[in-house]
Every structure is written in structure tokens, then in C-alpha cells.
């Protein structure tokens, strides 16, 4: 499989998924939109992954490329039916590109927190092998407030009703992070917007908490990756 990866910050890449892709002889190209990279045509790609980032989906004036990115996601998912995976901002962009709504969260989620599968999520192939409730890393202050028509909510948390979503048989997204590596928190904490959300000493506390859960995070990531590939391979 040849995957097109959209990134919005150099340090917010596919993380541990990269090692799984290399191991399994898949290939991928990345485009760094926040650095002014142009969006190439989707021809020749078998799937689209959209990663996280510090900007919000409505900040088109500050980040004009967001409009073109949303159009590309609509083309990829709704018209071409390409397999899709979106994380954090990528989750929100999928929702808005397909007609849903994203807004500021009433309560921001930052840190290691629990997510619970919905009944639909527990029955979904993408979450096969995962427990009904699991720990994950959250780092967001916006969320999907209305899913697009035809979407199904697969997971929720106390503060966020749409933690994971499926649209059609081929498109999946999650508000929470599953791509973590040992240096992820340190690297992301260098982004001013993320550092501000953490507050004084927050990066060190989050890094320690993430390290304590890293084995479980990585196991979950591999299971989700395996499931996604089985569905879309």
C-alpha cells in the first residue's frame, strides 16, 4: 500500500505507525502543509492519512491551505473512496470536510485519560482486540460537535462525545492519540500552543505519565494498525 500523509507540524508525524509501515513493506509520502508544501494529486495513492496539528479547522484566514486540504479530504473519502485514517486535527478535518461541525471544547482534554467504546465501537472491526475502556493520550481544546451524515460514533469520553468516528466502510478517525513514541511528548511540547495548554511543569508530568503507559499505547497502536490494514488492505 502507498499512503499519502498530510502533516501540520514537523514533529506531529505518524510516530510508531512509521515502523509498522516499514516492517510490512508499505510506502508513504508526507506533505508538510504548515511549511507551505503544495498538495499533489491523489492519483497513485492507495490511502490518505491526516495527522494532528496546533491549528483549528476554522482558522482558514491564518492557514489558507486548510481550505484546499478539506477539499482534498472530501475528494479522497467521499468521491474516490480511499481508505482514510485521521488523528486529532485529522479527525476534526474529516468531520468538517464531510459536512459535520467542529467547535471549541467546553472542557479541554490534556493528558493520559480514558476513552470508552460505544456499542457500535465494540462491534466495529477497527477496534477488534481492544478492551471496552482504555487509556490514551489527549491533547485538544476543540472537538467534533456534530458528525457528518452517515457517520457512526465509535468511542467517547466524559468530556468529549465523539472520540472516534467511522464514515462508510473505509474512513476512520480518532480525537485521541495512538501513534506515541518515547520522545513524542517532549517533541510536541516544543510547539507553543501545546506548551501553553500544559502550563508550568506540565510537559514533565505528561511525559512521565505517558512513559508509564507507553507499552500499552504501543500495543494498542499496533492492534489498530493491524485492524485498519485488514479492513482496507
Where are these regions (language model features)?
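Cysteine-nucleophile active-site neighborhood
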Residues: 51-121
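Glycine-rich, phosphate-binding/catalytic loops in enzymes
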Residues: 20-23, 64-68, 101-103, 154-155, ...
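Residues that mark the start of a beta-strand
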Residues: 2, 83, 133-135
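Pocket-forming structural segment of enzyme catalytic cores
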Residues: 98-183
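C-terminal helical/coil "lid" or tail adjacent to the Rossmann-like core of SAM-dependent
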Residues: 170-171, 175-210
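Hydrophobic anchor at the start of a short beta-strand
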Residues: 3, 28, 84, 171-172
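N-terminal beta1-alpha1 cap of cysteine-dependent amidohydrolase-like domains
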Residues: 1-78, 197-233
Amino acid at each position: 500500500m502507498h499512503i499519502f500523509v498530510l502533516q501540520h507540524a514537523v514533529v506531529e508525524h505518524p510516530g510508531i505507525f512509521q515502523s509498522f509501515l516499514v516492517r510490512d513493506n508499505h510506502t508513504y509520502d508526507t506533505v508538510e502543509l504548515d511549511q507551505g508544501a503544495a498538495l499533489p494529486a491523489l492519483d497513485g495513492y492507495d490511502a490518505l492519512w491526516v495527522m494532528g496539528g496546533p491549528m483549528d479547522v476554522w482558522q482558514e484566514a491564518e492557514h489558507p491551505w486548510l481550505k484546499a486540504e478539506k477539499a482534498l479530504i472530501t475528494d479522497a473519502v467521499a468521491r474516490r473512496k480511499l481508505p482514510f485514517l485521521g488523528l486529532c486535527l485529522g479527525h476534526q478535518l474529516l468531520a468538517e470536510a464531510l459536512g459535520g461541525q467542529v467547535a471549541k471544547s467546553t472542557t479541554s482534554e490534556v493528558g493520559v485519560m480514558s476513552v470508552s467504546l460505544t456499542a457500535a465501537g465494540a462491534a466495529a472491526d477497527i477496534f477488534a482486540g481492544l478492551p471496552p475502556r482504555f487509556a490514551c493520550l489527549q491533547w485538544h481544546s476543540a472537538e467534533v460537535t456534530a458528525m457528518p451524515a452517515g457517520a457512526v460514533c465509535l468511542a467517547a469520553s466524559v468530556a468529549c462525545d465523539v472520540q472516534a468516528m467511522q464514515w462508510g466502510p473505509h474512513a476512520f478517525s480518532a480525537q485521541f492519540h495512538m501513534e506515541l513514541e518515547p520522545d513524542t511528548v517532549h517533541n510536541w511540547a516544543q510547539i507553543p500552543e501545546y506548551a501553553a495548554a500544559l502550563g508550568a511543569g506540565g510537559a514533565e508530568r505528561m511525559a512521565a505519565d505517558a512513559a508509564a503507559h507507553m507499552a500499552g499505547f504501543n500495543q494498542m497502536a499496533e492492534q489498530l494498525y493491524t485492524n485498519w490494514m485488514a479492513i482496507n488492505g
